[in-house]
Amino acid sequence: MFRAYGNNGLKNPERISGENPDLYTQTRAAVQQRATTTLKRNEKQKLAVQNDSVFQQVGIGESDSDDDNGGVRIRMSPHRYIDPDDVFTLPEVKKQNALRDAKIAARAAQATAYNTFPSVKSLNGCQDPPETSQQSTSRKRSASNSRSPSRSHSRRYDRDNGRQRSRSREKKRRKKERRRKRSSSRSSSSSRSRDRSSRARDTSSHTLMKMNKPAKYAFLTDEEYRTCDAYISSAFITQTKSDCENYTQGVPKKEIAKCRLSVKFIVGLEHNNILFNNIYGAEYARDKENRPFWEQLDRYLKDVPKETFFRYVPPVGGYWKIRDRVDLLNLDHIDDDVLANDSDNRKDAFTFELEQAKKTFSENVHNIDALIKVISMEEEMCRRNVGSFSSSNPAALAERHQEMVKKAIKADGRNAKLRLMKIELLIKMDPNSPTIIDDFKNLTITFPHEPMVWIKYLDYIQYDSNVYNYKKLKNAFEDCIRQVTGLTNGTLLSHLNAVNDRPLLRMFHLWIYIRYLKWMISCAHTPVVLANIQATFEYNFGLADVEKRTSTNSKEREVRLEEFWESGLPRIGDEGAVGAEKMLKQSEELSDEDIQKLENDDFDILISRTEETIATCLQAQRDVQISWIEVEREMMNIDARVKRTKLKDCELYEDHVDDLETCELWDIIPFDRIRYYEAPGDCANFDFVQPFLELLGVKFLNSTNCFTTTEQIISDWISNDSTVNFYKTPTYTEKKCFEVGNNILKFMLYNRLKLTENNPEYLDKTMVKYLLAMLVTEASEQEKKLNFHSFKLNLKNLVGTFITKHPDIFKRAMLSKITGIVYMEKFVSWWERALKEQEKVVEADERRKNYKEIKMEEGVVDDVKFDVILLKKDKERVQTIRDKIRDMIDIAIPKSTEKLIQSADSSLPTLQLHLYANVLRGRLSILNQNALEETRDVFCKEILGIHTSEFESDEALLLALDQGLNELLEHCKEKDNLESVDSIPELPRAEALCEALKVVAVFVFLDKMAFSRRAVDCLIANAITKFEQFEAKKNDFNRGTYEKYCDQIDLKFITDTLITFFSHKKHRFIYNENFKKLIFQASQAFPCDSKYAKMLGELHSSGRLQVMKLQGFTDSRNSILNAKRDQQFDPELETRLLMNSLTIMFSWMNAANRIGDAGNQILYKNWKREAANTRDPAIWRQVIRVASKLSQKILKDDAYTRARGQCTWALNLHFDYIEAKTVRKNGDLMEMIYLILEQSMGQEHSLFVTDEEYMKTQQEIGLQYSESGR
């Protein structure tokens, strides 16, 4: 028999041997079978009751109880026992299980139905089933009916049924009529009579029970068919259906297989289906899990709730708190306290906290903080419900929240948070509402002292292309700067008393002004930015004595500044500028023509370079779009200088008027267009100087990176080595900005030198900061030109050039020593980078050689090209430069011949320089044995006063060295406390230098230690302790700003020293875990430093799993930062978010580079997410470069559309998009030009060349030149 059609796909019951049994034997067998089934079920249920006793968790660890998990078995009376399924199963699941059990029981009863009583006709499962036929609907007995011994009893049974039918004749008649109507609709009357007669002839005498015909391929689900041979056939054919179209056309019935996924694993991962479920989980119906009760309970207890959004209050009791189950069955009574303490009735941590917040707010409706918390948590709950079965309607929720906020505003109308929240809810309900701008304006008038009001107002206009307008955003920035300036200077008296944190308001004043300048740079308005910065320095430094300035004479200074601005004289940042006050005195004898001639040289350069650029770019035989973009970018830098007089008044303009009229150059910036930054009247530190100079590209030794542009950060991130890195995204005005910034730095430095010329030995903090900034800036420019694998570097020329440029600095002995030691530190860091780059080149060469050998063995001739070839002389050059650096250190800071503690010249600056020099000597000697021995001897001589050869053993040497370093550390602490005023600013303090020297000593004497790993572990533990102390000191309000600044310098120097030694090849793999801990702590302590962010990304870029771990870590950081950004002002928040995004992007880039072009899709997906989070045009420019490698459709419809939606004001963003388009059509260029001009409506300047006819003419000229040249 074919199993698919017999007994509903189940196994046939065993037959009783012998002849067909009589009625008595059948009855006895049925009773015995029923009794046996009941007995087995009772025994199984009894065993389950014993095994499923209630356990109570009482502890963790070993236990003498009956339970292996540390539980105690409790015997319970039967009347108190409740089935666990009845307690822990949902009612819907119970109902489904009951229906399933009923269907299974019905099929089993049909398959094994016996004649328990002779009068009841049933199908014997032990006999062969009769031929299937349809039961007659006629009440007439069939002629084929045979008589049975129990016929009389059957007649009585039929009469009883007849009596019951006679009582409901009307009901039967109605059913018969409905049945007849249905049958008439299916066939005609003739066919119905013919079918009736045929059914009457074929009807069996037995009353047959209706059988459910099994599915045709149900046998494939049986375990016997789960074999290797039948598995492939059962993978797809799971269900069939008839082809109705073929049937109606007269073609025989055809069965079509419906394929459905059944092989639920991926080849190679047969025993791990996690990846399969993540990818194909939605495409197949999962099998129901049948687990015992205690396995399910154990699984639920191990389930840990995960947060998808940051919450301000931590979970109640934490995630990992072990909770005891309350024995509800054995309690005399149950009250609310018992239910509250029960873990089953307790909600998850977030829901519980939300209920508590609602309760707190209901008790006091005037509690604003509770209302804000309730609204934020309900919004998070709504975000959680998206995609689930729970209903979530953000618009309706925002409307309900708005009503709550309106009621709270009536009670407290002077609360800025409530008023701001009302506008935010209105934006969620209707983002295009015309009243939002007016509401924001009214709010800024009422609360001009609240930074978050201005930030939300500016964000709404700037980062939404539907709202953005140049004039609208410009007016908003100017209103903000004007009102905040009045608050910081005390002129806005109406809200002066409302300011609670005046230093924070000053920081916001500077931050919002820098943000205004960054926006102008992105709009390609570099001349306006430079004009504002020059006016700022003239107002604060060029007019009179700044330190005596008060708010009473601010109007006079403004009038004086306007007079100077309109005179056309050189300003601070121009060549030859000495300040407005001095320039006005010197220009009393100059005429207007003489002043005009001061700018003739600059105009001559401008005209010649403009004509050269147009001729070179537009006349080249290239695509007109690419040529136009190149012209625009070149002109950005050429015409970035601020003009003091009009170009048309110059004599040179008349000779070149035809070429210059077609190019829209910048005109002079009038004084009424200037919005200079006015420093607070009682501010004497001038902390605003460094942010302005960093914006222009000047590098400082200790920078916060909070005020530099993203393009500069990415440019510094890109190193001149073989590492995969970001695409270059310059603003094309860096050269002119750097030139102006460098001139301003020189002015500030020489101004401080003149102030301290009467006391040359005094180390002015501001003067040393400007001096080291000039040194680091020039060194960074030299670093960009270096090729570290060859490392061609002339040390003497670099130092000599710097001395020649600034001779006044080296006239002071201490300044020359400070300059020399900082220059030596730069040289040492370059030498270390050269070693790493050479190691990378050697590894790459080995990989290429191995690849070439494998190809040759396979018989394939593959010409492998080496991008970088490391020569023997390159390795020798690195060692030669190391020796030269050591000699220069010895010249700058000579070695001490006695102990540093007993030195005659034991001043604090001298001690700092000696310690710094010894740290550099240790860094240079780590990879050379001869230099290592020499450095050990120097350490013993300066720390212990004796040579290393005088010790009998290494243990005695190490013990004495440790004691000497501890003694030196105590001496340095005492020096810092007593002579802190004489300490060298911008350098680490003596205590930090001594701590770094201890680190160097460990690595210098590492091969002499018996327990080297223990010593390195102690260094990392000590460093982690210092990070914790640094966080505590940073949050200590009793410490001053300068002390916290020095703490940051000290910890950075110690961390960099540790990183230097861990980065060497011989230590990188041995102490890899220690290195990871150190980088992780450094990235947390200094989140705005790109150096540690890049290292963190490199450590987590070895594979996709590492990147995903880093992604989870940074996502948790970003959740906290985003929550803070919505509630409070912090100048570091934007930079920290940017660094986190760059870290993730860098890691994904290195991971995707391992698989070639196939990784571009992964790269694009993750970079796009980071760009949307940062809202930075520079990041979107990176995304556009990746999108161009995927497809033009993704570039246009997704990447560029999203980027323009957030940063439509960024001009370079549009240029990068046009350049990335590979498929260009006629008219695309003019279409983009019109789009840019439309978006820049109201700007003073947008594009340089917009005439299509002029571009075509230049192209024809270039074509004629090329033909004539042939």
From Swiss-Prot:
Self-association and partners: Interacts with nrde-3.
Biased composition (Polar residues): 119-135
Protein name (database record): Nuclear exosome regulator NRDE2
UniProt biased composition (Basic residues): 164-184
Keywords (A to Z) from UniProt: Nucleus, RNA-mediated gene silencing
Pfam families with a match to the protein in the record: NRDE-2
Function (record text): Protein of the nuclear speckles that regulates RNA exosomal degradation. Involved in short interfering RNAs-mediated silencing in nuclei. Functions with nrde-3 in the nuclear RNA-mediated gene silencing (RNAi) pathway to regulate gene expression via inhibition of RNA polymerases I and II during the elongation phase of transcription. Required for exogenous RNAi-induced H3K27 methylation.
Gene Ontology biological process terms from the UniProt entry: mRNA stabilization; negative regulation of RNA catabolic process; regulatory ncRNA-mediated gene silencing; regulatory ncRNA-mediated heterochromatin formation; regulatory ncRNA-mediated post-transcriptional gene silencing
UniProt record similarity statement: Belongs to the NRDE2 family.
